[in-house]
């Protein structure tokens, strides 16, 4: 029973992680380390021409056109 619960929780976690878009609320693009890494992330994935780290702790990369 313990292994079954573990597998169910693991499957739910993977499904939730796959459902969340990488540019919505998930720290991406090098934030909070560097705005230049965020800009490079935006350019390489064609989300915009530049980008910067935003949010309370600069944890979210926001791409700008």
From Swiss-Prot:
Q: Tell me the compartments it is located in.
A: Secreted
Ranges in coiled-coil conformation: none
Q: What are the cysteine partners in each disulfide bond? A: 31-53, 38-61, 42-63
Q: Which key words are in the record?
A: Disulfide bond, Ion channel impairing toxin, Neurotoxin, Potassium channel impairing toxin, Secreted, Signal, Toxin, Voltage-gated potassium channel impairing toxin
Q: Which InterPro entries match?
A: Scorpion_toxin-like_sf
Tissue occurrence: Expressed by the venom gland.
State what this protein does. This recombinant toxin inhibits the mammalian voltage-gated potassium channels Kv1.3/KCNA3 in vitro with an IC(50) of 26.40 nM.
| Comment field (misc) | Negative results: does not have effect on BK currents (KCa1.1/KCNMA1 channels).
Domain characteristics, as noted in the entry: Has the structural arrangement of an alpha-helix connected to antiparallel beta-sheets by disulfide bonds (CS-alpha/beta).
In Swiss-Prot or TrEMBL terms, this protein is called Toxin KTx8
User: Which species is this record about?
Assistant: Lychas mucronatus
